[in-house]
Amino acid sequence: MQKREVFGFRKSKVAKTLCGAVLGAALIAIADQQVLADEVTETNSTANVAVTTTGNPATNLPEAQGEATEAASQSQAQAGSKDGALPVEVSADDLNKAVTDAKAAGVNVVQDQTSDKGTATTAAENAQKQAEIKSDYAKQAEEIKKTTEAYKKEVEAHQAETDKINAENKAAEDKYQEDLKAHQAEVEKINTANATAKAEYEAKLAQYQKDLAAVQKANEDSQLDYQNKLSAYQAELARVQKANAEAKEAYEKAVKENTAKNAALQAENEAIKQRNETAKANYDAAMKQYEADLAAIKKAKEDNDADYQAKLAAYQAELARVQKANADAKAAYEKAVEENTAKNTAIQAENEAIKQRNETAKATYEAAVKQYEADLAAVKQANATNEADYQAKLAAYQTELARVQKANADAKATYEKAVEDNKAKNAALQAENEEIKQRNAAAKTDYEAKLAKYEADLAKYKKDFAAYTAALAEAESKKKQDGYLSEPRSQSLNFKSEPNAIRTIDSSVHQYGQQELDALVKSWGISPTNPDRKKSTAYSYFNAINSNNTYAKLVLEKDKPVDVTYTGLKNSSFNGKKISKVVYTYTLKETGFNDGTKMTMFASSDPTVTAWYNDYFTSTNINVKVKFYDEEGQLMNLTGGLVNFSSLNRGNGSGAIDKDAIESVRNFNGRYIPISGSSIKIHENNSAYADSSNAEKSRGARWDTSEWDTTSSPNNWYGAIVGEITQSEISFNMASSKSGNIWFAFNSNINAIGVPTKPVAPTAPTQPMYETEKPLEPAPVVPTYENEPTPPVKTPDQPEPSKPEEPTYETEKPLEPAPVAPTYENEPTPPVKIPDQPEPSKPEEPTYETEKPLEPAPVAPTYENEPTPPVKTPDQPEPSKPEEPTYDPLPTPPLAPTPKQLPTPPVVPTVHFHYSSLLAQPQINKEIKNEDGVDIDRTLVAKQSIVKFELKTEALTAGRPKTTSFVLVDPLPTGYKFDLDATKAASTGFDTTYDEASHTVTFKATDETLATYNADLTKPVETLHPTVVGRVLNDGATYTNNFTLTVNDAYGIKSNVVRVTTPGKPNDPDNPNNNYIKPTKVNKNKEGLNIDGKEVLAGSTNYYELTWDLDQYKGDKSSKEAIQNGFYYVDDYPEEALDVRPDLVKVADEKGNQVSGVSVQQYDSLEAAPKKVQDLLKKANITVKGAFQLFSADNPEEFYKQYVSTGTSLVITDPMTVKSEFGKTGGKYENKAYQIDFGNGYATEVVVNNVPKITPKKDVTVSLDPTSENLDGQTVQLYQTFNYRLIGGLIPQNHSEELEDYSFVDDYDQAGDQYTGNYKTFSSLNLTMKDGSVIKAGTDLTSQTTAETDATNGIVTVRFKEDFLQKISLDSPFQAETYLQMRRIAIGTFENTYVNTVNKVAYASNTVRTTTPIPRTPDKPTPIPTPKPKDPDKPETPKEPKVPSPKVEDPSAPIPVSVGKELTTLPKTGTNDATYMPYLGLAALVGFLGLGLAKRKED
């Protein structure tokens, strides 16, 4: 800070921080203070805060707004406060001229004490007071002018008489002076002439003597020098002449030899040049001919190569064709010969075998017929006896079987119930054990963390304790030195600053408003207009405090205690134990003001700043009791803690009232510890104060107040004493006399030097007691079931002997004819390449001879010059000696005259004048705007919006002092991204700096701006205002801000607080609509039921419902630039599982009204999207996995007006169909969406569904028993009746859609199988219906199906009725199986696959394969008539298809065998009862409905 201007007023409590600024300019809103009665400490803060998140799934910028910086918190807590003021100079030109004229006229002018006009806080008040001062100045000037004029007349008369006498005296004096002047001139003339002559003579004599000595010395030196030079010259001359002669002789010899050598070399070089020219001419001619020949040969070679390559390509193509044709013909012929030979060999062998078989068959047949007739009669008798015995055993078996099955079922039911009960109990125990594990783990983790912290704290404690012990020892050794405690102590109390404390005062205590208290005090006679100077001055002191609205304004009544409670303390502790509350009890004990019953007091919002009170230049004594409480609300005993009683002034009172003001602490119930060298002493009643003035050296003080009474002074201990607490309740009186205003701060900031803080030993954590897990219940014992009785085994009937049939004799086959040999093509003749011409030989360039260089000419020698002979300098002549002159005598001087006495002058009058002092406090205002310049205070704007803070100051008043500095400091809110370049551009006229550590921007007016402000100080001047530019970055954040203006380091003021909020803040008291921005995504079926997490069948449609969450934007005032970032909704759908249905997309508002102006675009990937879309998603930090849809507002501004700013959320219905092929693999698919507002992304939850894999199965059985043998891959006899078992795919429980279709489609091979028209359909598992009823597994569901048969193509389709399927609960699984009865009608191997359709999606089963061999004695089949189709609800008993045995009475009747031939008739589908169900079957299906399966039908 610069040194502030001092205007000559006392250092009051209000003005201490200004080092003597004008009375009343008080710093009221104080930040971090020490426990001085009236000082302020500057505090630095940083913006480094822990990063946390908002809890909202924001895709970009998810961090929550950090805690406000300390600087910002303190600044806003002191909003509106003022520190100091600017002096206003009212023109006193007329008064000054009158004073100057009076002084010039000789009037005695006395300047009286300046009149204090107080502080103007408004422009109107300022103007009024300036007018009053001008009027006062004019009145004074007029009175001074009158006195001056009268005095001037008296002076004129006196001057006339004086002038007359002075003239006479002057005439006599002039004559004397004239004579004296002539005398002095003559004396001076003579003296000058004599002195000149003497000086000239002495100078000439001195110069003569000097010149004579110099000449004599020079002549001697010259003679010696000449002799030396002459000797040297003669020696050098002889040496040079000899050297030059030798050099000349050597040079002439070398020139002669060089000339001879160069003549021989030049002749030889001329011959070499001629030979080289001839060789080059020959080489150039040969090279030219070579190049021509080479070009011709290369052209011929290129033409020959091209022609050969063309012929070669044609030859190779033709050769390849001929070779392939011949090879194909040869291979075909050789194969035909081989096959023909093999066939004929086989036919010949077979024909030979046929002959042998025919002969053998005839002989065997004749013998068998005879034996058959004898065996038949015996078999029939044995079979009748066996049947009667079997029926009796069967009845007994069935009775016993029923009993055993019931007993076992009862035992099983009891056991299963016990198992379920046991599972339930153990599940509960396991859940409880899991919680115990988690609690134990949490306890362990917490203990380990506390233990680690304890160990770290212990190490720090030991280190701190060692430093503390050393500091205490040092304090002991220096206790008698100035500034140290006379009894060394350590500090265990930390009670220094609590700016965020919550102050409460009982409602029974009246808290005054500013104007209300002002009126009350004025009623007491304390008024600016009171002619009693003491009371008018007291008012200015009172008004300086009362104008600050951060204090609680109270009136204390004598002996009536008032409690002021502070809670929510954050920074205070005693011996490491946190202090959460402090209670001050104030009681007025006595006052010398008025009737002694009341006094004003002001309680600070910070308990460490404490309070101001008044004494109105009388005396006041207030008792203060202080109690501290811990976090449990228990009263704390702070015995041993130290408190600071400082800035206890004496002798610095108002010069206008009484300078001997005194501040003291009295009746302290603790113990004082004096500071060595301090002015504060202990007195009776345990009081402490200074015995004499500690304000001025001239009055005995060690220092002036300004040298010790500041927070930064190293001597501030001079006015302090330390109190040691000895009781739970601290009590003392704060007392004053003639002080006006008194600020008393109670805290632990000790002014003494070297008071260490005693470290607190950490407490070791207690190891937790872990819970023991509970044992599980033992499983119930499995019951022992009775074995079912063994069913009787019927002795098989003896088969009737087969009647032999006369064999059909085979016919021999003819041989195959031999194949014809092929005719082969001749291969083409290959082309012959013409040989290339050889290239000519290239001539070789000759090797040229090199001419020999000439010998260089010898260098001519450089001859040395002969030396110049020395010349002797002639001797100088000696000078002539001067003669001394003769001097003139001096004349006699004239006599001086006696002057007449002057008259007595008139008495000088005395006039008095005074100036008036006026202070001004210019007002400031902070405005907050968006990029469009719209005021957004107390409103909402979107995250990432540009927010501008305008720092405005009202016009500077006329009469102001020269503005030397004009500084605005703005501690920015956290989460506000400051743009330095934009701020500088918007803040012309200021030098802008930014401190990143404290997140503070400072504007200093430039020299040019200050020059504008100072151009005419007599007129008001409008100020420039800087603008802070930046962006708000956080969701759900509140950005509050104010700034501080400091002018000339003499006046400071903190502005109002502005506020703006971003959406996404739940429970926002300022914006009731504000809450998390949480778009949602829900999957629904077509009925609108939520199907998130459910099983979704392939082919089903997901009706995704996307909520565009906009309600928290209601009242938003974002700028046009922010709006142009647009509004979008992104659906990142799984394209591998779903197909979008853009034709079904709908957008509606919350009331269901359709919304226009929103478009949707689908992109296969991020890479396929336009660059603009890629940039949009990147900025919003959205990464899509593949294909995605982008919904966008066509006109962002209209969309903003209609939906965003009104807080109207939208609902997008976005249907998507599950791909059919996804059901064949099954699996999970996920879907996630994002909302993008103003460029900010917000994610929905992930919606997860699963598509079940439908795996139908096909078996071949001979009964309806599911456990019967599967004949897949085995043999089925010709004409055997069997079943194709079609097991449908499993539809899991908790599926999303009702079943509309569940069918079995079997495209059987009609060449080998014949459908009998009989089928049965059963439930494969328990089914739960919508009405709560249950259909048990194994229930016959045939009546709930319909069947269709396509006899021509061999297709049977069994469908469940839709009304039955829709009765099944969505929570129930579903699976069914159908048995199709078939009859094998042909020999061979037959494959079959069927298709299970679920909601129109087809799924192929496995393929079954059965083989029918040629029977040894096949029966002749009887064709089965085709029945008419029947309603399955009205079953009809069909005729049993018969497979007759050979008849005895017709032994010669042959039965033809059909090998792989289709029957000419096929029965139509019908429904049969269970009589013939063991023989149901279904033909194999391959390749139905485009499934790509290979169906083989043999004709």
From Swiss-Prot:
Q: Where in the cell is it found?
A: Secreted, Cell wall; Cell surface
Q: Which segment of the chain is annotated as a signal peptide?
A: 1-37
Which is a Pfam family this sequence falls into? Antigen_C
Which intervals of the chain are annotated as region Disordered?
A: 50-84, 689-709, 763-907, 1409-1472
UniProt motif (LPXTG sorting signal) ranges:
1466-1470
Which residue windows are transmembrane per the record? none
Q: Which family does it belong to?
A: Belongs to the antigen I/II family.
Compositional bias (Basic and acidic residues) spans? 694-705, 800-815, 839-854, 1428-1450
- Tell me where in this chain the PTM Pentaglycyl murein peptidoglycan amidated threonine is found: 1469
State the protein's purpose. Answer: Adhesin that mediates binding of bacteria to a variety of host cells. Plays a role in the bacterial invasion of dentinal tubules. A host immunostimulatory component, it modulates the innate immunity response. Plays a protective role against some antibiotics and cationic antimicrobial peptides (histatin-5, HTN3, but not beta-defensin 4A, DEFB4A).
Q: Which GO terms describe its cellular component?
A: cell surface; extracellular region
Gene of this entry = sspB
Q: Where is the composition biased (Pro residues)?
A: 789-799, 828-838, 867-877, 888-907
Phenotypic effect of disruption: Single sspA deletion, bacteria invade human dental roots less well, adhere less well to collagen, decreased accumulation of mature SspB; double sspA-sspB deletion, no invasion of dental roots, collagen adherence is further reduced, as is chaining on soluble collagen. Triple sspA-sspB-hsa deletion no longer causes human platelet aggregation; double sspA-sspB deletion still causes platelet aggregation. Double sspA-sspB adheres better to human epithelial cells and is internalized better than wild-type cells, but induces less host cytokine production (IL-6, IL-8, monocyte chemotactic protein).
The protein's matches in Gene3D superfamilies, at most eight in alphabetical order, are given as: 2.60.40.740, 6.10.250.2200, Major cell-surface adhesin PAc
Q: Which organism is it from?
A: Streptococcus gordonii (strain Challis / ATCC 35105 / BCRC 15272 / CH1 / DL1 / V288)
Which residues are removed as the propeptide when the protein matures? 1470-1499
Q: Start-end of the Ag I/II A repeats?
A: 145-219, 220-301, 302-383, 384-465
Query: Would you tell me the protein name for this molecule?
Result: Streptococcal surface protein B
